Amino acid sequence: MTKKIYFDYASTTPVDPRVSRAMLPYFNEKFGNTMSLHYFGQQAKQALEESREKVAALIKAKPAEIIFTASATESNNLALKGVALANRRKGRHLVISSIEHPCIAASAEWLEKQGFEITRLSVDRYGLINPEEVRKAIKKGTVLVSVIHASNEIGTIQPIGGIGAICRQKGVYFHTDAVQSFGKIPIDVNKMKIDLLTASSHKMYGPKGAAALFVRKGVKIEPLLHGGGQESGLRSSTINIPAIVGFAEACQIAKKEMKENAAGQGRLRDKLIKGVLKSVAGSYLNGHQKNRLPNNANLRFDGVEGESIIIQLDLRGIAASTGSACSSAKLEPNHVLLAIGLKHEQAHGSLRLTLGKWTKESEINYFLKVLPSVIKNLRKISGKL
């Protein structure tokens, strides 16, 4: 099979060639350590601060409020654990949703072991949180609410502005994991009343190894890494300048091209969804029909296993997934799909297709041509035809 089609952009994206070019000088010519006082160090320091400005501009933040990390997992850990530990005298209660990324869920479990109380909010059948449920969950001693902006699994976009307004009114910090939405749809941390926000480079055509945590000025947060005091003392470690420069370039590109990319991907996504539902009996859309990321299509099929579909598609040159690559080694049903009310067998029969800015209509057409026979053959093998 020579044809190779990539429908797994939510797992990771290829690096934009413009990003690669921006990074190159910082491997050999401009290789300094940002903490050094000499020319090479100051050259790197300047690149760092210019990068901070570019990342901040994408979400209407102040440059000083951007803390660079090595991954979204690190940023999410810093947000939850850092805020909880810094504010434990004020209270020991946090609120998260039932559809968070595994690194948020695991951080919350760790905090429970340290004596913190965690409230997990349920979602409706589309994966949406009711902001009023957030209001009800906040109580005396609540220090943080963390709700994912857009689901990495089903693409549903949460009413972040409404949740942020409630948290601000109640005097509680509000964090959102915006890894999937950052660079794809507009975000304004001020209008949305966001206090902390997680973003990742490799989900938006930047390199792996760079991410950020927006921390609004005045938020009390403790570092998890101690050492040289880099990143305003919140993230000690030698700064990975090439990756951060690449991340910043990806942000600048996204700022210019976001609207066009969203429109193009949304059109192809809609064609894909309509084509599947029309051509494959016993197929259904998971998540919200309209209030979802422009590049996400999560579908389920009666009588087949999602992993079997992936293997068969891969043999035909199509790369897809059943969900987060960070937890794909686990055989349990996807927790997000269970949270929206699917039964175990329905969750196991789901397929996530995520498009990117280089996805072509011809690739959608090829997928729609191949899929019906794949599903039919798998159902025949399983005796569900």
Regions found by a protein language model. Give the residues of each.
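Pyridoxal 5′-phosphate
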Residues: 1-385
